[in-house]
Amino acid sequence: MITGIQITKAANDSLLNSFWLLDNEKGEARCVCAKAGFNEDDIVPVSQLGQFEYREIPMEIKPEVRVEGGQHLNVNVLRRETLEDAVKHPEKYPQLTIRVSGYAVRFNSLTPEQQRDVIARTFTESL
């Protein structure tokens, strides 16, 4: 467990009023700020700090969000029949725009193979 502290008394005067993060499991201390002798983010064994007294500092710990990979959803609000009719009669749908892989494209600008793929992916019988 990590504990935030402010050193209130210490044999080493440069530690007075410094702030540290103590990792009791590892027996280490990370310097948050100190007047002298230690740099920000220095990690030292707690024993290196010598004798000291401290007060605990409340810490707000925000969980780290880690996102790997991902998914996206393209929403096309229309009927299957509309796309099938656009394949047969493209002149009737010159402005028909759909979402494909996050981009807006004119349905008529797709190749016939791409059009069939869009129809197959957009309309499924079940999940």
From Swiss-Prot:
PANTHER family referenced in this protein's UniProt entry, alphabetically: FORMATE ACETYLTRANSFERASE, FORMATE ACETYLTRANSFERASE 1
Protein known as: Autonomous glycyl radical cofactor
HAMAP family to which the protein is assigned, alphabetical: GrcA (MF_00806)
Gene Ontology molecular function: formate C-acetyltransferase activity
Segments forming domain Glycine radical: 5-127
InterPro entries registered for this protein in UniProt: Auton_GlycylRad_Cofactor (IPR050244), Form_AcTrfase_GR_CS (IPR019777), Gly_radical (IPR001150), Glycyl_radical_cofactor_GrcA (IPR011140)
Keyword annotations of the record: Organic radical
Organism for this UniProt entry: Cronobacter sakazakii (strain ATCC BAA-894)
UniProt function note: Acts as a radical domain for damaged PFL and possibly other radical proteins.
SUPFAM superfamilies with a match to the protein in the record: PFL-like glycyl radical enzymes
GO cellular component, one term: cytosol
Modified residues (Glycine radical): 102
